[in-house]
Amino acid sequence: VCSSDLDPGIEFGKLIGQDLEIFRRLDELHTLGFPILLAASRKTLVGNVLGGLPSSERLEGTAAVNTFAIARGARIIRVHDVRAMARVARMTEALIGMSVDGTPLERCRADGTIVDESELLPSGE
């Protein structure tokens, strides 16, 4: 079962600049000792930074946010596009040498159970 986490609350009562500052300082939050949960998938922040894109066109922005967050210590990422973002996470892990602290990312369901990597792959991969 996944442990307790720290969610910085992207877009909850903050301005865009404040949310961007949270992203830039995720590595500091990581030092508190809790897995960081990030939920920025398709957020308005992503759409606004990319020129007002609708949520259906925010995949690339979400991928960039998640890559940056993983590199800065986020360990739990809530997403809409699970397979695409699992691939982004896997590639990011490879680029940064698995993970910042040597542990694999936790991929959790809403009920707290950990998702098996094989569940994220299409049949035959």
Where are the predicted features?
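Short, small-residue-biased leader/transition segments that mark boundaries at the very start
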Residues: 1-3
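Conserved phosphate/ATP/ADP-binding segment of small-molecule kinases
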Residues: 9
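Active-site-adjacent loop and "lid" segments of alpha/beta metabolic enzymes
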Residues: 12-125
